[in-house]
Design a protein with these regions (language model features):
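A short SAM/SAH-binding and catalytic strip from SAM-dependent methyltransferases
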Residues: 122-133
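Conserved SAM-binding motif I beta-strand of class I
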Residues: 77-82
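Conserved class I S-adenosyl-L-methionine
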Residues: 53-62
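Glycine-rich SAM-binding Motif I of class I
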Residues: 64-68
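Conserved SAM-binding loop
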Residues: 91-92
Length: 201
């Protein structure tokens, strides 16, 4: 099935509207909203790394695609954090109609100031912000970990070289695995992957 049809099919099935890029309020620190392709999310869901007992935190959630899809497919709890009020309202509108809305929460907040709930043990990023903000967010995640030690997996889709270089220097993080997604798209782009890091107890 081609990507465009797959996008429409899943939005219809989940009873949400998440397609389309949005550059509103994007700047050098916070990047435009662009949803993760459903084909990539299917691969993540099929990995078995996110399950019913997990709580997923999605930074820069936009209209909530990751949250609705993963909650529907894996039955996990999901929290989406979005700083853009206009896009956050679209996520909340989707929540009213979405199939899996009962397991999804949204927070209107700046990621670098958001307190990570102690139940969160899976965290998703699709290049939502600059390296400068990522460092502050990782510090928040580590604070949450030290308050309640548990295994936390961090998923980075389409990561930049600077993201990976930085993550490799964080003592508490260890590289765990990667999910190759190059075959889903034309061009054999080496960034088409989900890189997984872990904070282990």
């Amino acid at each position: 099935m081609n990507e465009e049809k797959n996008e429409t099919r899943w939005d219809r099935l989940l009873a949400v509207r998440t397609t389309g890029r949005d550059d509103t309020n994007a700047d050098q620190y916070r990047y435009p909203y662009e949803p993760t392709p459903y084909s990539v999310l299917e691969r993540l869901a099929n990995s078995g790394l996110i399950r019913k007992e997990n709580t997923l935190l999605d930074y820069g959630c936009g209209k909530g695609r990751v949250d609705f899809f993963m909650s529907y497919q894996t039955r996990c709890q999901s929290i989406g954090v979005e700083y853009n009020e206009r896009i956050y309202e679209k996520a909340m509108n989707n929540k009213e109609s979405a199939v899996a809305s009962g397991r999804v929460l949204f927070a209107l907040a700046n990621a670098e100031r958001y307190t990570v709930p102690e139940t969160v043990d899976r965290i998703y990023f699709f290049n939502p912000f600059s390296l400068e903000l990522l460092k502050k967010v990782i510090a928040r995640i580590l604070n949450s970990y030290y308050e309640n030690r548990r295994t936390v997996k961090l998923f980075f889709y389409y990561p930049s070289d600077e993201y990976i270089a930085y993550l490799m220097t964080v003592e508490e993080l260890s590289f765990s695995d990667e999910i190759d997604c190059r075959d889903l798209f034309d061009g054999n782009n080496v960034r088409e992957k989900i890189v997984i890091f872990e904070i282990a107890v």
